[in-house]
């Protein structure tokens, strides 16, 4: 897991990515805990929101695992905080991968 700056050494190419953004950093940790317990996903990173108390979580795995993890994360987060956005990219394009690292640690 990467929180803040630095570059991940792990290669996530070919893995689906699930991204969710919440209004509370604490709720993000509760949600990512539920996600990682619900399915075989790796938490790629947690990025703090610049203007608020929230954060964005990126997790990687197979499409089915990322979907199950996302469902679990959102179910736990919904009563705790505002869910700004969430999405799953089943097969990120080669050029998309570097862009997902650009904001890490910013």
What are the residue ranges of the model-derived segments?
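Short amphipathic alpha-helix segments
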Residues: 26-40
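Short, low-order "capping/linker" segments at domain edges
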Residues: 94-106
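A common structural junction motif
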Residues: 39-42, 74-83
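Metallocofactor- and cofactor-centric catalytic cores in central/energy metabolism, strongly enriched
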Residues: 58, 86-95
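Short glycine-/aliphatic-rich beta-strand segments at the starts of folded cytosolic domains
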Residues: 11-23
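Short, Lys/Arg-enriched N-terminal segments with co-localized hydrophobic residues
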Residues: 1-7
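Helix N-cap motif at beta-to-alpha junctions
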Residues: 60-66
């Amino acid at each position: 897991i990467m929180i803040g700056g630095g570059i991940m050494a792990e290669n996530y190419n070919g893995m689906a990515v699930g991204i969710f953004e919440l209004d509370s950093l604490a709720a993000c940790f509760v949600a990512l805990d539920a996600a990682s317990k619900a399915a075989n996903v790796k938490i790629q990173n947690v990025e703090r929101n610049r203007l608020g108390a929230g954060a964005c979580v990126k997790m990687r795995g197979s499409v089915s695992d990322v979907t199950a993890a996302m469902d679990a994360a959102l179910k736990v987060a919904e009563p705790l905080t505002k869910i700004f956005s969430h999405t799953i990219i089943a097969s990120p394009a080669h050029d998309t991968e570097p862009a997902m690292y650009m904001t890490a640690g910013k």
